């Protein structure tokens, strides 16, 4: 084998150092300069509350431990983030009045980002304000209330959240509530009750987005029937690829296209990979076998034995790897079924325990956009995915609200509308 003369080595190194930049990186940067990248769902406020407790009000947010948090200011900048819907989530297992109190604290915590770092964040309420914040070099911050239980059956509480800057309401979280069925709980209403329909109407009147992540398919279809404005799924993926009820079926995707809404793709591995979903269910079944109360668990009273048995099971049944490419598959599928005008990004960063390879934090959005470009997506279509689609939905909801401005505020109650005693 011939070797290169040593005299050529400096020239080759210099040539490599001045090689043309990655064409996809350049294209992504151009798109994100013109269009704000908007993520529909990030649980950073709740993650701060959970992991640093009372220090959440004062902990420096510029740089946080990436092993603990998916988000910080430096990584938001590196990821080219232009707009973020911060989730204000509280457990659906709490009494609803407690959920209201905790929601108010989460809202204030999200507002504190802009209060503490005004050069980095700007709190916004409209599509135009979001574009202006992006143009000024700030991350536009919006709020999403992640669960209908958080209004405690009160349209007045819903209006108060709107006055505090909430931009969407997720109709349920993990539990079915008095007026809407959840995707992950036993149905009670076959979708929305009359009060649930009144909530959708009030959301339209207020200019708040109707978020259908977490709800049952019956609730999805009822909301799509009732709403006057386009809906969002703030963090859901394609059920045809991963068959969990948290994802969106092709039937509903076609309805979303007709409605003008947008499905913002989730990164949670159990909603991305069917193999990972099945593995997770099997693992949960093993844990239940070890600990089934009161007397039937294989390792009742023997926590070390249960721990070893689970480790042995995991060794024999390794966790399936989930990747950035699989997330892109969901985006491709939704674009194919509903159209490229109806897909976005809703990562669920800081709300999940693990993430796909290649999507470890908010700095990784450009890698996902580059993957789609490799698959043949045009810059214009990537811009739609990144932010233009949800901006269109926001503007449409604002227009609907303007047309309903003469209507009185809703005053219905669960008892009055649903006949609940």
Identify what each model region corresponds to:
Residues 5-14:
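Bacterial N-terminal signal peptides
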């Amino acid at each position: 084998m011939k070797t290169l003369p040593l005299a050529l080595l400096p020239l080759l190194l210099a040539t490599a150092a001045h090689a043309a930049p990655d064409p996809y990186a350049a294209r992504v940067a151009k798109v994100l300069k013109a269009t704000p990248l908007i993520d529909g769902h990030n649980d950073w406020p709740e993650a701060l509350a959970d992991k640093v407790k009372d220090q959440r009000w004062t902990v420096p947010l510029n740089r946080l431990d990436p092993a603990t948090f998916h988000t910080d200011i430096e990584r938001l900048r590196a990821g080219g983030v232009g707009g973020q819907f911060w989730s204000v989530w509280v457990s659906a297992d709490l009494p609803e009045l407690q959920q209201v109190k905790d929601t108010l604290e989460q809202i204030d915590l999200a507002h504190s980002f802009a209060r503490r770092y005004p050069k980095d964040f700007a709190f916004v309420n409209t599509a135009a304000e979001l574009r202006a914040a992006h143009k000024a070099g700030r991350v536009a911050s919006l709020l999403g209330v992640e669960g209908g239980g958080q209004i405690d059956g009160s349209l007045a509480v819903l209006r108060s959240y709107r006055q505090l800057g909430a931009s969407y309401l997720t109709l349920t979280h993990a539990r079915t509530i008095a007026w809407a069925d959840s995707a992950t709980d036993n149905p009670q209403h076959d979708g929305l009750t009359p009060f649930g329909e009144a909530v959708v109407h009030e959301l339209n009147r207020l200019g708040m987005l109707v978020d259908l992540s977490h709800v049952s398919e019956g609730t999805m279809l009822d909301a799509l029937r009732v709403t006057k404005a386009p809906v969002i799924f703030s963090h859901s993926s394609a059920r045809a690829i991963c068959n969990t009820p948290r994802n969106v079926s092709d039937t509903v995707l076609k309805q979303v296209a007709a409605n003008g809404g947008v499905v913002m793709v989730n990164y949670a591995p159990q909603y991305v990979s069917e193999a990972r979903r099945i593995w997770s269910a099997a693992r949960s079944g093993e844990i239940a076998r070890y600990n089934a109360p009161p007397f039937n668990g294989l390792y009742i009273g023997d926590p070390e034995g249960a721990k070893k048995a689970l480790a042995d099971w995991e060794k024999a049944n390794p966790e399936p790897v989930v990747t950035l490419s699989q997330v892109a598959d969901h985006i491709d599928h939704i674009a194919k079924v509903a159209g490229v005008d109806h897909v976005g990004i809703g990562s669920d960063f800081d709300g999940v325990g693990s993430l796909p390879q290649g999507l470890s934090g908010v700095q990784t959005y450009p890698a996902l956009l580059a993957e789609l470009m490799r698959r043949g997506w045009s810059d214009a279509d990537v811009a739609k995915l990144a932010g233009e689609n949800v901006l269109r939905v926001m503007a449409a909801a604002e227009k609907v609200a303007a047309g309903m401005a003469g209507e009185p505020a809703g005053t219905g109650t669960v008892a009055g509308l649903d006949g609940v005693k």
